[in-house]
From Swiss-Prot:
The keyword Repeat applies. WD repeats lie at residues 37-77, 80-120, 122-160, 202-240, 243-284. Keywords: Nucleus, Repeat, Ribosome biogenesis, Signal transduction inhibitor, WD repeat. It is found in: Nucleus, Nucleolus. Residues 365-382 have a biased composition (Basic residues). This is p21-activated protein kinase-interacting protein 1. Negatively regulates the PAK1 kinase. PAK1 is a member of the PAK kinase family, which has been shown to play a positive role in the regulation of signaling pathways involving MAPK8 and RELA. PAK1 exists as an inactive homodimer, which is activated by binding of small GTPases such as CDC42 to an N-terminal regulatory domain. PAK1IP1 also binds to the N-terminus of PAK1, and inhibits the specific activation of PAK1 by CDC42. May be involved in ribosomal large subunit assembly. Pfam families: Beta-prop_DCAF4, WD40. GO terms for cellular component: nucleolus.
């Protein structure tokens, strides 16, 4: 288990969490040990994401850097976007989706690190995106005051909803039965079946991060030191606790045997791990904390779990016309992309093309056969 945090100071921090056995009369001990610091970006880090092998970081320098956590090396960099990278989401271990201030959303093949599809998603910035647990749909919000639904099977826009203000967070629930949209200090809860707001949660200050603890329980952090836990059905605040000495910037939750864990990162330079009780009305207990000495901006938790081959995005449409060629180096040097000529071969997100190859099209063969029969009839008449 590795806690990974990005900072305004352009540095990436990694801490390995060591779990000690519980002693008589004492709880199990969790100890974060500094593992690495890495300075590869030329501007502050804005977003992090992880799967079972990689951690990826997005920055205001418009690049995405890839880190192989099993080999502990920098794997490469992607330079497709022309604006601050604002959102990164893995779906399983085969695909990554990125969004940026250039208004584009890109789908990447993680095995080859190739851009399979580019959407012109918003007229303004893409501020956040979230993938449905099924992998068939994605939601995005941007600075054009729209909430957009994407059909990832066909690789196209499915629905556009106008909202009154610019939303900066959108997130699916773990089951995919509901989703939330955050505007300033308010969380609108939507039901998937009706696509309408079923209720609104109001926080004290502007919301900076949210994470679902269960299908109906949501942790909310704002521009303050407090984290609040809400019930999305009753809209009731179940509990709140002071997590940091400065505003909380990002949160991640996950489950391991015997523990449901919430991790928080703050401008005060601390990463903290909290264990959540079954009764969410009881505030969580602090497991451990790590001090970085930097102003933290984003957070992810890398869990060394076996790859799940079933988790992958369904097929999408054709690859982006400016298909990038990625040069990979394992030495830890920065790897840039070189744009190659457009690839004429059709592909899909799963990597298996179902399009007929040139010269073997059934339509072309049928036309050729009809032309041959017409030629024979013409010769008989002559």
């Amino acid at each position: 288990m590795e806690l990974v945090a990005g900072s305004y100071e352009q540095v990436l921090f990694g801490f390995t969490v060591q779990r000690g056995p519980a002693k008589s009369g004492h709880q199990e001990t969790w100890t974060p040990v500094a593992d690495f610091t890495h300075h590869s970006h030329t501007a502050s880090l804005s977003v992090l994401a992880s799967n079972s092998r990689y951690v990826v970081s997005g920055s205001k320098d418009e690049t995405i850097h890839i880190y192989d956590m099993k080999r502990k090396v920098e794997h490469g960099a992607l330079v497709h976007h022309a604006g601050t990278v604002t959102c990164l989401k893995f779906h399983g271990n085969q695909h990554l989706i990125s969004g940026a201030e250039d208004g584009h959303i890109c789908i990447w093949d993680v095995k080859r690190w190739k851009c399979l599809k580019t959407f012109k998603a918003h007229r303004g910035h893409v501020t956040f995106l979230s993938i449905h647990p099924s992998g068939k749909l994605a939601l995005s919000v941007g600075t054009d005051k729209t909430l957009r639904t994407w059909n990832l099977i066909e690789g196209r826009s499915a629905f556009i909803k106008n909202i009154k203000e610019n939303a900066h967070i959108v997130e699916w629930s773990p089951s995919g039965g509901k989703y939330i949209v955050v505007v300033q200090n308010k969380v609108d809860v939507y039901r998937l079946g009706t696509a309408s707001v079923s209720g609104t949660i109001t926080n004290g200050k502007r919301i900076s991060s949210v994470t679902f603890l269960s299908d109906s329980v949501l942790a909310v952090a704002g521009d303050e030191e407090v984290v609040r836990i809400f019930d999305c059905d009753s809209l009731e605040c179940l509990c709140e606790f002071r997590a940091h000495e400065n505003r909380v910037k990002d949160m991640v939750s996950f489950e391991v045997p015997d523990h449901h864990v919430l991790v928080t990162a703050s401008n005060d330079g601390f990463i903290k791990m909290w264990t959540l009780p079954q009764d969410k009305k009881v505030p969580p207990s602090l497991l451990c904390e790590a001090k970085t000495g930097a102003r933290l901006t984003c957070l992810t938790v890398w869990l060394d779990r076996a790859a799940n081959g079933m988790a992958s995005l369904p097929p999408a449409a054709e690859p982006c016309p400016d298909q990038p060629k990625t040069i990979e180096k394992e030495s830890g040097d920065t790897v840039q992309e070189e744009t190659s000529e457009p690839n004429s071969e059709k592909s899909d997100v799963s990597g298996d093309s179902k399009q007929p190859t040139k010269g073997n099209s059934p339509v072309t063969a049928k036309k050729r056969k009809m032309a041959t029969m017409s030629e024979k009839k013409r010769k008989k008449k002559m």
